[in-house]
Structure formats: C-alpha cells, structure tokens
Amino acid sequence: HEGDGLMTSRSDQALVIKVADCQPILLAHNSGSCIAALHIGWRGNRAGFIQKGVKEFCQNYQLRPSDIFAVRGPSLGPGHSEFINFQTEWGANFFSYYNLHSQTMDLWQLSKDQLLQAGLTAQNIFSLDLCTYSLPELFFSYRRDAVCGRQAGIIWIKR
C-alpha cells in the first residue's frame, strides 16, 4: 500500500489525504510532536492497513499506541457500503461487519475496531459520522455520482 500513509514530526509540513468515499484517518501523538495520515479504502481495511500504519508510526517515533489520538473523517457510511460479492471481496473473517439483508459493510465500525486492535484506547478514537454518499451538498461521492471529486483530510503540527 505504498502511498496510502504519511507521517512527520516537522512543524512546517501539513499532511493531506485526498478521498471521495474512502476513510481519511488522522493520527497524532498526545504530545503533539508527531502526526500521521492514512488513506483507508475497503481493500486497506481488508489488508489490515490501519494496524500496519499505527505500528509503523509507533516504531518510527518510539510511541505507544495508547498515547495516540485518531480521527476518522467523512466517508462512505454503513448504509451505502454495498458489496454484493462479499465472499470473494471480504471473506468470513469480516462477516460480523456485513449486513446480509442490505449487502452493506459497516466500514466505520471495522476501522474503529482495527484502531482498537492496533492498541489505541477507545477514549482516543473520534469519528465524524458523516456519509459522503448521503450528503451531496457537502461531499463528493464516486459511488453516488460516478464522478471522481475529492475532499481532503489535513493534519499539521502547530508550534
């Protein structure tokens, strides 16, 4: 997943993740000394990119996951994350996130659980539960419009 994550400890550099329906996940150490930004598409969720990104961030800056804050930005909500080929696209390990009736995945809950699995604490995980598909006046959505617009998740260190 080369290019799906960025990190820095420089105060003169913003990190930007551009998404349409994917999840921007912004990370910051509680001291404010280092930050990271992850682009999480469904394939990234499936591949455990959140856990890998947190691990790399912690190793690079000698951090404990429990000292990291995370914010998930607007993205495709649980009611619109349709996967009609669940078995081939996801598999049995993700069945608890799949709604068989609507054939949709709860990617928001999956990402939260993956952050917890990576060692973050529940009180340090924040979510903007705004669905890009459901709010056309606010967000681009490729799933809704088949047009490739983008919004940005931005994080920086202010000193």
Residue spans of the language-model regions?
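Active-site microenvironment for binding and transforming phosphate-containing groups
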Residues: 1-159
